[in-house]
Amino acid sequence: MRTTGFSGLLSATVVGVYVLVVVGATAALADAAAACQGWPLCGGDLSDPSVPVAVLHRGVAAVVGLLVIATAVVGWSETTARVKTTLALALALYPAQVVLGALVATGSALANLHLFVAMAIFAVLVVGLAWHLEAETGSDDAPESPPELAPPVDEEPAATEQPALSGLARAKATARAYFELTKPRLMWLLCLVAGAGMVIAGTPTVRTVVFTLGGGVLAIGASGTFNHVLERDIDRRMERTSDRPIATHEVPVANALAFGGLLAVASLWAFLSVNLLAAALGLAAIAFYSVVYTLILKPNTVQNTVIGGAAGALPALIGYAAVTGTIGIGGLVLAAVIFLWTPAHFYNLALAYKDDYERGGFPMMPVVRGETETRKHIVFYLGATLLGAGALAAVTDLGWLYAATAVLAAGVFLWAVVELHYEQTDRAAFRSFHASNAYLGLVLVAILIDSLAV
């Protein structure tokens, strides 16, 4: 199935409105837009370099307004009643947005309301897009009754005999097994999250960076190791995880527990070298992922991914606290972005490994609610993530680099998610999964560069 013309038009309108959200939220660009003191003509000093930016902003707003009108007109004959409602809301709100923009340009203190209305238009269009994609590509694939999930394994299977290895080869294999326990693939992104939290808070010292990121790597390693221990029986049932070191008896459980405990203690020592709050948050992150997520959320509720997003959000607070010793609004909003991004990211993997998760006994969204509902929720959480990224610009001093990166990366992520609805294959799910990784990675790098360049 290929993307239809209206889906493409609606997606383009969503991106266009998001451009206005990010521009309105980014302080440097919003100040430039204020260089025009007249409306509808600019009336600014042409020698002021901010004037071209302001004129461009108004031009983009005019084009986006035409897109909103065109989307409403085309959609009125091509989509469902509830999607028409969202289009009507956007069409009604856009003139109010224009009036607010005129008042802001002529000196009225309504900039926050102007931004809020832009966010509201974006939100209703995202909901409309999710509903339209559901109606056009979805099916009634939700199970009529909860699926029969696999029961837990009661007995530890016997260890399989390992091939004989030389001393050096055995040492390398053992080191590789312990390294795999730490879930190293998670480290780069979570370190970027902590790094972004630090630079949003201020300019960290080299010592703070080293101990915070070092503590973070050790905390991730401890959490990953405990997760391997606690899920070893389930890992053996799942094709994706059946070759993990503890599941294959390559690492004994007792040794893994000792290794995880050592990493946790080292992590807390590193965080304590920064400050007490960073250490408390680091301990909370280890406990949340290892106990709350692994033992309580993941095997028992379909909302495991959503609530579990708190584990990925905590590094943002750790980074912020490492610099200031407190938790501020910038750190909280960054943490919210990560929290909202997590379902939009992980639901793609849940789609690709749906059968494996069902075999493992995990009530993931595709297993319990079906693939159609899961794809719709990816759109919802993607929209919420983008709004969070816009809010982050509003509460920080991030500039044009962040704004441009956020918009371009969002466009690619949205394209991958829309394509997922029409292609509905494992390949499309992985493409959307990688697009989500790229989105967050690029946005975090932009935060680092933009903040440090100021």
Curated annotation (Swiss-Prot):
Q: Where is this region: Unknown?
A: 1-186
One GO cellular-component annotation of the UniProt record comes to: plasma membrane
The membrane-topology field of this record reads: Multi-pass membrane protein
Q: TM segments?
A: 9-29, 59-79, 87-107, 113-133, 186-206, 209-229, 251-271, 276-296, 300-320, 321-341, 377-397, 398-418, 433-453
Subcellular location per UniProt equals: Cell membrane
Kindly list the GO molecular function terms attached to this UniProt entry: protoheme IX farnesyltransferase activity
Task: Please verify whether the record's keywords include Transmembrane.
Answer: yes
**Entry keywords, A to Z:** Cell membrane, Heme biosynthesis, Membrane, Transferase, Transmembrane, Transmembrane helix
Specify whether Transmembrane is a keyword of the entry: yes
Give the start-end ranges of region Protoheme IX prenyltransferase: 187-451
Q: Name one GO biological process term.
A: heme O biosynthetic process
Q: Which reaction does it catalyse?
A: heme b + (2E,6E)-farnesyl diphosphate + H2O = Fe(II)-heme o + diphosphate
What are the EC numbers? 2.5.1.141
What pairs make up the disulfide bonds? none
Cite the InterPro entries for this sequence.
Protohaem_IX_farnesylTrfase (IPR006369), UbiA_prenyltransferase (IPR000537), UbiA_sf (IPR044878)
The region called Disordered is annotated at 137-164
The protein's annotated pathway: Porphyrin-containing compound metabolism; heme O biosynthesis; heme O from protoheme: step 1/1
Q: What else is known?
A: Carbon 2 of the heme B porphyrin ring is defined according to the Fischer nomenclature.
Instruction: Provide the family line.
Output: In the C-terminal section; belongs to the UbiA prenyltransferase family. Protoheme IX farnesyltransferase subfamily.
Its annotated function is as follows: Converts heme B (protoheme IX) to heme O by substitution of the vinyl group on carbon 2 of heme B porphyrin ring with a hydroxyethyl farnesyl side group.
Q: What protein is this chain from?
A: Protoheme IX farnesyltransferase 1
